[in-house]
Amino acid sequence: MSKKSTSAALPSSFEEAMAELEQLVARMEAGELPLEASVAAYKRGSELVKYCAAQLEKVDNQVKVLEGDMLKPFNADRAIEADE
């Protein structure tokens, strides 16, 4: 027997997830949804936020690999001195 998923499928891209999340937030802020639908929207929004965070972390790790030894710790004091 297959397990039935109670949540919608994950989006195919970060941009798609963000667009859906923006729509959910707008509907919730506008007060268009009844209580049960608001809870479902909140749950879906939470899933989308987790998906987006995972995508951002994945891309961040890819950038770190690509930059390799070029990455250096940021020194705020030096940045301020350079601006002066």
Swiss-Prot record:
Bidirectionally degrades single-stranded DNA into large acid-insoluble oligonucleotides, which are then degraded further into small acid-soluble oligonucleotides. Its EC number is 3.1.11.6. GO terms for molecular function: exodeoxyribonuclease VII activity. It catalyses: Exonucleolytic cleavage in either 5'- to 3'- or 3'- to 5'-direction to yield nucleoside 5'-phosphates. Heterooligomer composed of large and small subunits. Belongs to the XseB family. This is Exodeoxyribonuclease 7 small subunit. Keywords: Cytoplasm, Exonuclease, Hydrolase, Nuclease. Pfam families: Exonuc_VII_S. GO terms for biological process: DNA catabolic process. NCBIfam families: PRK00977.1-5 (NF002141), xseB (TIGR01280). GO terms for cellular component: cytosol; exodeoxyribonuclease VII complex. InterPro entries: Exonuc_VII_S, Exonuc_VII_ssu_sf.
